[in-house]
Amino acid sequence: MKFCRGWRGARAGQFARLLCVCWCSLGACSCVRESTERSGVVPISPSSQQKVLFVFGKKYSGHVYLVDCVERVCEAWRMRARVVEYGDLTRLSALPRMKVVLEAVHEMRPDAVVSLGLPVGGGKYLLAVKRERAQTLIVSLLPEEEVLPMQAGSDILVDFQVKEDSLEGVAEVSNTEAELQSLLRAACEIVRRRGVARRAHASPLQEFRGAFANVTDSLREQGVFSSDYAMECYVDPETGVRAYNHVLLSKRVETFRFVRSYGGSPGRSVHERDRM
């Protein structure tokens, strides 16, 4: 009987310790839950809340592979996307109505605007977006608009540098599908990172370089992308002023055809040469 009482006492002690452990665990969970409620933290990825407006200029509209690229990337990162193409800009007039972009921003209230080949006259509307919605990230790729309006209206402006030994009189740029998709994916990567970090932790040049490297490295592993690029900030040929948010790309691997020969002084961007 003494053995039984001792055994029962031991079991009772174990049960008491188990209750104590459970009570402490519940208390810790409630403290974590209370702390989460106080801080306003919601266990949902910020990228799932991001809305992105894409604007395609004349040269890049009507290409299914670009729209498919946007849809795949935004679906993978749970972004809501809307694409405004050149046909949407010219639906009511022969010339593009760039005000359509501003109207789309008012309607969608996007976290970011990504343009590819923005037509002439679009820069002032991007600047209007920045004035009305300073928190909206604007990434501009290969614009046809003048340099200064694009620099003023963009957080990150990306163009291709033209080499000094280019030929005069050629006014076209040859882009591959892989290159255009890489630019779009890099822009989306920047949008995603900004959504997580809430603000930039690097310069526009560093930010784009990192995003573009991630994209191209992934494509190289798939055997899709083979070119290598150097990047630098745009320098105004007349004043010598370096643009903080204007990134110029130039190929290190010349065998990969991308930019045809252009004339003019070195350091000027492709869309400047188009107007020469």
Curated annotation (Swiss-Prot):
<feature type="lipid moiety-binding region" description="N-palmitoyl cysteine">
    <location>
        <position position="29"/>
    </location>
</feature>
<feature type="signal peptide">
    <location>
        <begin position="1"/>
        <end position="28"/>
    </location>
</feature>
<keyword id="KW-1003">Cell membrane</keyword>
<keyword id="KW-0564">Palmitate</keyword>
<keyword id="KW-0449">Lipoprotein</keyword>
<protein>
    <recommendedName>
        <fullName>Uncharacterized lipoprotein TP_0938</fullName>
    </recommendedName>
</protein>
<keyword id="KW-0732">Signal</keyword>
<feature type="lipid moiety-binding region" description="S-diacylglycerol cysteine">
    <location>
        <position position="29"/>
    </location>
</feature>
<dbReference type="GO" id="GO:0005886">
    <property type="term" value="C:plasma membrane"/>
</dbReference>
<keyword id="KW-0472">Membrane</keyword>
